Amino acid sequence: SGQSWRPQGRF
């Protein structure tokens, strides 16, 4: 996946 604030995948 990939967040808007953290385009790393998952956090």
From Swiss-Prot:
Specify the species. Answer: Lissachatina fulica (Giant African land snail)
Disulphides: none
Q: What is its main location?
A: secreted
Sorted alphabetically, the keyword list is: Amidation, Hormone, Secreted
Which positions does the record annotate as the modified residue Phenylalanine amide?
11
| Listed name of the protein | Cardio-excitatory peptide 1
Summary of the function given for this chain in its UniProt record: Potentiates the beat of the ventricle, and also has excitatory actions on the penis retractor muscle, the buccal muscle and the identified neurons controlling the buccal muscle movement of achatina.
Record localization: Secreted
Mention any one GO cellular component term assigned to this protein in its UniProt record: extracellular region
Record carries keyword Membrane: no
Gene Ontology molecular functions? hormone activity
